Amino acid sequence: MHNKQQVKIGIIGGSGLSESEAKKEIITIKTPYGEPSCPYEIEKIDDIEVLFLRRHGQKHSIPPHKVNYRANIYGFKNFGIERIFGVFATGSLTENIPPGSIVIPNQIIDFTQGMRANTFYEEKKVVHIDFTEPFCSEIRHYLLETARKIGINVISHATYICVNGPRLETAAEIKFFKNIGADIIGMTIMPEASLAREVEICYAAVAVVANYAAGISKFPLTVKEVIETMEDSLDAVGFLIKETIKKLPEERKCLCKHALKNASF
């Protein structure tokens, strides 16, 4: 049986990231925002326990625009989680970031505004969090340092543009997104990242580039291509996250834990 007080790290991923044969402890958490994507799982990394959640549900049955992001993040907060690693499949908008690349993005452009429930503060209290730097600087530092030490090549700076989906983009949309500064594209980082900031959870992303986006790829885009590339990269991503978790200091020294300070009237 786990000690809830000792589980401080969460991982949000898709199918395939958590496939160990060890018996897992299943945690069901109820929230005022409805049901999370699925029950949480307690995983063990050496002697460190982490709380894992499959963003799209146990059988990848929830499309990006239907994920209950508020319930998912609330569940982590309710459990006492202080840091979250988000894992993503993305498309590349530039030939400088080829399929198979592992990216630690540092910026976000959100094209889901107004389409998804994106805040915990809709009534009684108005909160405006500082989202200048959308990812935890401390986790990013340890991800990049760990990648260098264990010999995993990562791209250290990239802007992730989040779209609503579930359809893939047109070639004209991709050209536009590239022109406004996006490097990789996906459908799930928002409002996940900003909700984590609203509850003062540190959050960082590890993105796998599954394919070139529309108009850049010379071939039709397929889900099979995404799945195959993700499967090829999961070992490296899992190893990077596990080794990073082992190096994180117990006490957080970033600004994320004070995100609500001076954020409301």
UniProtKB/Swiss-Prot annotation:
Homotrimer. It comes from Thermodesulfovibrio yellowstonii (strain ATCC 51303 / DSM 11347 / YP87). Pathway: Purine metabolism; purine nucleoside salvage. Although this enzyme belongs to the family of MTA phosphorylases based on sequence homology, it has been shown that conserved amino acid substitutions in the substrate binding pocket convert the substrate specificity of this enzyme from 6-aminopurines to 6-oxopurines. Its EC number is 2.4.2.44. Pfam families: PNP_UDP_1. The record marks 169, 223 as: Important for substrate specificity. Catalyzes the reversible phosphorylation of S-methyl-5'-thioinosine (MTI) to hypoxanthine and 5-methylthioribose-1-phosphate. Involved in the breakdown of S-methyl-5'-thioadenosine (MTA), a major by-product of polyamine biosynthesis. Catabolism of (MTA) occurs via deamination to MTI and phosphorolysis to hypoxanthine. This is Probable S-methyl-5'-thioinosine phosphorylase. The keyword Nucleus does not apply. Keywords: Glycosyltransferase, Purine salvage, Transferase. It catalyses: S-methyl-5'-thioinosine + phosphate = 5-(methylsulfanyl)-alpha-D-ribose 1-phosphate + hypoxanthine. Belongs to the PNP/MTAP phosphorylase family. MTAP subfamily. GO terms for cellular component: cytosol. Substrate binds at residues 187, 211-213. GO terms for molecular function: S-methyl-5-thioadenosine phosphorylase activity. Phosphate binds at residues 15, 55-56, 188. InterPro entries: MTAP (IPR010044), Nucleoside_phosphorylase_d (IPR000845), Nucleoside_phosphorylase_sf (IPR035994). GO terms for biological process: L-methionine salvage from methylthioadenosine; purine ribonucleoside salvage.
